[in-house]
Amino acid sequence: MPLTRDFKETIQQRARRDGRFREALLKEAVDALLAGDLDTGKIVLRDYINATVGFEKLGSATKRSPKSLMRMLGPRGNPQARNFFEIVAYLQKKEGVRLKVRAV
């Protein structure tokens, strides 16, 4: 289900001013992907990118076109693990966090 523009704007505004919220968004995206929920993970990751670095800057950092990154994380996108982890590594560095995977 697509999010309404007002909701996306609310997410972006909060992410711009709240570092813990940004960290939680990034963690939520990775958690969803690791749990096998690719669709939710991609949606949350796109929202995170749009609210923080943007696809232009991410494209420059990863040497990929912003449109390619948007397609990769779009509804029909299927990112390769190498691309996904390169994106996550850059976002962690940019955010100043280090996510860890733990068995529960």
Where are these regions (language model features)?
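Alpha-helix N-cap/helix-initiation sites
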Residues: 19-23, 38, 55, 59-62, ...
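Short alpha-helix boundary/capping elements
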Residues: 33-34, 49-53, 95
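Signal for well-folded cores of large energy- and translation-related assemblies
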Residues: 16, 34, 74, 89-92
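Short C-terminal boundary/hinge segments that cap the last helix of small helical domains
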Residues: 93-104
